[in-house]
Amino acid sequence: MMTEIIRKISKISTKNKEVFMKIINRILAFSMCAAMLFAMVLGTVGCSSAINAENLLEGITPSSVNGKQADEGFISSSADFAIKLFRQSVAGDKNSLISPLSVMLALAMTANGADGKTLQEMETVLGGGMSVDELNEYLYTYMKTLPSTDKAKVTLANSIWFRNEKGFVVENDFLQRNADYYNAPAYKAEFDSSTVDDINRWVSNNTDGMIDRIIDGDIDEDTMMYLINALVFDAEWAEIYEKRDIRDGIFTCYDGSENTVSMMSSSESLYIECGNAKGFIKQYAGGEYCFAALLPNEGVDILDYIDSLTGEGFVNAYNNAEYAEINAKLPKFSYDCSLSMNDALIAMGMPSAFLKADFSKMSNEDLFISQVLHKTFISVDERGTRAGAVTSVQINKESCPDGIIEITLDRPFVYAIVDNATGLPIFIGAVLGLGK
């Protein structure tokens, strides 16, 4: 193009050529300014993801540690934790969604700073009584072996943030263990508005923008530490729905209201039964993960059904899936949840962490868990599923049958995103209402 412009300039008279060249020079000058401005804008955008807080572990390579492959004991205790936490998190007639893995990772990091009765209770709730050392080894290997591909991405990130305050000492062994097993950077920060921005920026970056913040407003003056996990699941279906597969349908909500939804139809081949519910398994691309849906039988209340679920029952249902011909209908849906897990975890058996806690392996201060905040997001459509989760532990100082099976998810149902290698739910939720 530039060669053509030069050729045309050569045919212009000298006087006109001078005028023309002035115009060209102005255009070039304007273009250079625009390019510089564009580069500055890009630079500003790129820098917005930077963390201002000081990472005390930057440049330090985590120590080599031993891991353990998921076995029957780990799968059983993890499934038990997942279903108990799910049962405790369902409230009223609202949609729910949790990531048991995200909550477990954040609490396991926290448990590395616990001792005495506080540690015993956390070990019982998180690992069915296994030591935190064993749990670290299992989770270390599990995180590293979770498959992640272009069409079925799973990413995990952990971080620790603590207040830069005179006299507040965080134990080096606590930070080292969480760096070794959970690859968690340790940020020393002022806990002012810039720290709020840093933490929320970290959350957004590590959930692909699905969750943009975990802290609203100012940080309480008694808050000394945050231990945070972020998890992303983004996968295409093994067989993406075509336009012809999507039709309007009616979804009957828990409160009896009826709403029009986009219902996606497909033929599935894995049938599951779990207690008073039947459902299907739908694979994601690559076959490493699946979507499991459970529709309670007619006349069975969804909340009663959820209350009857057990970890053993869920894993057995998954493992005993049968081949069958299923006409499945799945509604498109998208929603987010924000839950405080305090009451759920206390009810599950770890009250000491929230009351008279012993976190002497974490710091020289008298500390306790003031809040376990869990935020999730999910979107299910014809392409696949996007889901994100963030768990923040806030630490304060004291102050198959015969024939074709029809399964239409047109009323409240339970679903899970499952790791096919272990049968463990990475996410588990319940849809009680959809529509406008």
Task: Show which residues each predicted segment covers.
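Short, positively charged
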Residues: 75-85, 385-404
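Short, Lys/Arg-enriched N-terminal segments with co-localized hydrophobic residues
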Residues: 1-20
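C-terminal, non-catalytic macromolecule-binding modules
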Residues: 311-314, 345
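Residues that cap or delimit alpha-helices
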Residues: 115, 307-312
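Extended hydrophobic
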Residues: 227, 278-294, 401-436
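Detector for small/aliphatic-rich hydrophobic stretches
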Residues: 17-191
